């Protein structure tokens, strides 16, 4: 009984014990990223009401918006090797904040129907806005991940340094979750009370928070390392390739070969991205001791597969809005519950995550999250309703149970990078590994797109008084079942073959 009590006490107190005031400015940058969801509910409803984009088109857009996260190695190499105005950290965060602000201003222009925001169609301006914001967050994320290794006092014994590095990663994710708690319910309530334009104006506070954090942070910054041309030049060439492929997808091609190529531009970009990132990682890992190298590679593969699993897509939320009649305030309530329990879950499991093997963590994450999605499938087939249970009750309970596990999968890998990345190259290490993990999300987005093309789900779209797209949720049930089966079987089989099975 004493051991259980001690374990619970340690779980509750460890994050507090490991917090230091010198970590606070760094955590403000993570906090700003987590608080970006303050306009999330308003944006979801605005997109549904104002943009003529299908579920497949929105998923496809999400794939393209994940590409900046995939080319993080370019930003990482710049942060490691190219000071701007003598700064390797602050100026990059300032630039990122400026891009986020620019993207938000475009959203304000769209929502307020200002003439200066009509230089292109609403859909295209929205894409530009989203892209600017994403690039800004990517740049800030690269710098924050690098700083997470520089706020730790490395003059301590190595064992303590490694433990502190692990807890800085946990505290960073706690900061993101804490911000989510503070804005989750607020986002829904604001969407009920204020106009979309006003909410987007309020969200301009986000880049200000990150600017304050990076301005006051104290770091042990390594000297700039020499530019790694294969990574920087290759990354820039890859970025140009991605932009050209993205542009070409939306052009009319009379040449059949070009039309075929650009029809599958997302798939081509994914395959090229995978090859480029794996090659660059091989360059970074070549000097690592073989046993450690093998462990890092296996860990990366497992987390890649876990994050590459498909989701249901936007059709689920559309169904909840149109059929279950979930409104903005209720979505805000769900977000609030999820965010609160997410931070509690990460807090309680922090000691477990820091000390348990990654495959052990991911197995129970996979099983638990799969089981907890089953009530939502039940809602589609009216099982809770037939038992007299209200859909909102099911949604609240499901969110309450599932949310603590959403943020945990990346912490073990980030800790490994923080421990083994050499001084002067940490930004590149973080960026490349994060690029690989975000490429996994791109893979998940592609799988989601394919499933949505096979099992079509559509909301009702009216244009000029005419129904141009009818409402059809008949395929949503089978889509959710297939997604659930894939999400539980593929990661567990991968973990078994790489980490569990004896040689």
Where are the language model's segments positioned?
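Intracellular loop-helix junctions on the cytosolic face of multi-pass helical membrane proteins
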Residues: 1-21, 111-128, 139, 151-312, ...
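C-terminal ends and interior cores of transmembrane alpha-helices
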Residues: 94-120, 367-389
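Transmembrane alpha-helix termini and helix-breaking/packing motifs in multi-pass membrane transporters
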Residues: 77-83, 108-116, 180-201, 250-261, ...
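Substrate-agnostic recognition of the 12-TM MFS/MFS-like secondary transporter fold
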Residues: 29-30, 63-75, 125-188, 309-310, ...
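Helix-to-loop junctions at the C-terminal end of transmembrane segments
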Residues: 69-87, 191, 344-364, 452
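Short extramembrane helix-to-coil loop segments that connect adjacent transmembrane helices in Major
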Residues: 49-57, 321-330
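C-terminal transmembrane helical hairpin of 12-TM major facilitator-type secondary transporters
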Residues: 360-412
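Primarily marks hydrophobic transmembrane alpha-helices of the MFS/SLC 12-helix fold
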Residues: 92-93, 362
